[in-house]
Regions:
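Membrane-water interface at transmembrane helix exits
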Residues: 17-21, 46-49, 76-84, 244
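Membrane-embedded alpha-helical segments of integral membrane proteins
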Residues: 2-50
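Hydrophobic alpha-helical transmembrane segments of polytopic
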Residues: 4-7, 67-73, 237
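A structural signal for short, hydrophobic/glycine-enriched beta-strand patches
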Residues: 79-235
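Internal/C-terminal transmembrane anchor helices
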Residues: 58-83
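A transmembrane-helix-recognition feature enriched in membrane-embedded lipid enzymes
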Residues: 231-249
Length: 249
């Protein structure tokens, strides 16, 4: 129990620090709540066990059974989604594909978030080797509402030597599904190369590919590394995202 208590305390501090850095999302909140519950359950397990021994009514047993089923379902979903996330990797890239870069947050000053900057830097490696590739930067207004992710990404690419006439903006999307759907519209409206390379974070490749198939894109995937200090939050958030896409379909 001491190990669980320490783990719960560590998780609580970790996710509080993550939120302090400005990465406030459903993954961070979930991680924080679960960590607090683990800490409390481990610290007060003797009191909890004593309380449980005094409450053995049928209603109590039913509540416990439901709780155990919910916990089992959550763990099962977590294992399945984690397996799916780990199962997809970057695959071989064709030359001069249309590059679709998926947005992931903008800082208050309009600069890309650390996660989005990793995606851009990964895309730049391919773009410098494929000078005839067109680029679609995809992402609307972030939660702060000041800058669109697409505009922030365009500015960053231009600063790093990419010509502006190669870049097409998709600045209306607010979800991965809309990223793919609206980018497909930009692709068709501008008669760009139908073979696309979707650039996103490594943890996000499964869902990006899932939606690319849904919209019948001829696609390949290129994953970027995720900063270690936000990976747990984004990983948990991605589990919700995968579940949402399954339900939406």
């Amino acid at each position: 129990m001491k190990i669980l208590e320490i783990a719960g305390l560590f998780g609580t501090i970790w996710f509080l620090c993550t939120e302090g850095l400005g990465y406030w999302n459903i993954g961070t909140n979930t991680g924080l709540i679960v960590s607090v519950l683990i800490f409390l359950a481990a610290k007060y397990h003797c009191q909890i066990r004593e309380w449980c021994s005094r409450h053995k009514s049928r209603f109590y047993k039913m509540i416990c059974s439901i709780l155990y089923l919910v916990i089992a379902a959550v763990i099962s979903l977590a294992v399945i989604t984690t397996g799916l996330i780990l199962s997809v990797h970057s695959n071989g890239q064709k030359e001069n594909s249309t590059v679709i870069i998926l947005g992931s947050g903008v800082n208050d000053d309009g600069r890309p978030s650390d996660v989005m900057r990793e995606r851009l830097d990964t895309a730049l490696e391919y773009l410098n080797d494929n000078p005839h590739s067109a680029i679609i930067v995809s992402g609307g207004l972030d939660d702060q509402g000041g800058y669109t992710e697409a505009e922030s990404m365009k500015d960053y690419l231009i600063e790093h030597g990419i010509k502006s006439d190669r870049i097409y903006l998709e600045n209306q999307s607010h979800s991965t599904r809309e990223n793919i759907e609206y980018s497909e519209t930009v692709l068709q409206n501008n008669h760009l190369n139908a073979s696309v390379l979707i650039v996103t974070s490594d943890f996000h490749l499964y869902r990006a590919g899932y939606l690319a198939r849904h919209y019948h894109l001829d696609y390949e995937l290129l994953g970027s590394p995720t900063p270690w200090y936000v990976l747990p939050s984004y990983w948990i958030r991605e589990m919700y995202g995968i579940l949402h896409e399954w339900i939406a379909d």
